[in-house]
Amino acid sequence: MLFRSDYEDGWALARELKVPIVDEHYYQAPGWFINHQDFYDTYERGGTRVYLGEYASHGNGRANTLETALTEAVHMISLERNGDVVAMSSYAPLLAKEGHKNWDPDLIYFDNNNIWPTVGYHVQKLFSNNAGDRYALTKANLLNDGRTFPDNDEFAPFRKRFASSCVIDSKTNIATVKIANLLGFEVKTTLKLDNLVPASVNATKTVLTGDIFSRDAKPDTPESVTLDRTTELTLKPFSLTVLSIPLK
């Protein structure tokens, strides 16, 4: 006998009724987000879309750490890639008052006198402030100590801890490249802008990094960098790098 889940039956009904959008919720361990970057890649196109209304990465003790924040970044990179299916997303829960919490993690904690944004908050802010309406396909070649990580089964555990995306804002004509490195060592990759920019361009780089279990990591001060059409980047261990690039 073939058993179907409520999830499968719900989606089948939504498509049959031509429901415009379905609200999905899930809370998972960091490893789930690392291993399910293709979660929406095989969703049916051109029909019912997804509103990811609640999601969060839950680590040991349900703390909001750099690890959980970076795995959420990896997931949001996959959401950008599948923007034709995922119409919207929102982290949950958002706010929690100390002494009156229903659960952890939450995105922003507060009491009567203080506010404590989490690492996850900073990741969400970097994505929301650097959104786009067009997606540009990306491909990453990874290098560590002169050693290439080929795209095969042997190196799959390494490559799964790395994700990248490029979106373009048509109104501002700015491209944003987001690169998440969940590996515990520096990785070199090459950014090829080809015909998107002139010979060189001044871009803005913001990096969020720190100890993998840090609960108070914050983005570094944005810095101006010069990018050529082909630029080698060194990505810090356990980091999210955001490049804001004005196009020609």
Tell me the role of every PLM-derived stretch.
Residues 1-2:
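Short, small-residue-biased leader/transition segments that mark boundaries at the very start
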Residues 6-15, 191-193:
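Distinct, well-ordered alpha-helical segments
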Residues 8-12, 37-41, 75-79, 112, ...:
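Generic recognition of flexible, low-complexity loop/linker segments
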Residues 13-16, 20-130, 184:
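Catalytic-core region of carbohydrate-active enzymes that cleave or remodel glycosidic bonds
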Residues 116, 120, 126-150:
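A structural signal for beta-strand and strand-to-loop patches characteristic of beta-rich domains
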Residues 157-199, 205, 241:
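Carbohydrate-binding surface patches
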Residues 196-237:
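Acidic, Ser/Thr/Pro-rich beta/coil linker or hinge segments at domain junctions
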Residues 243-248:
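Short beta-strand-to-coil "C-cap" segments at the C-terminal boundary of structured domains/repeats
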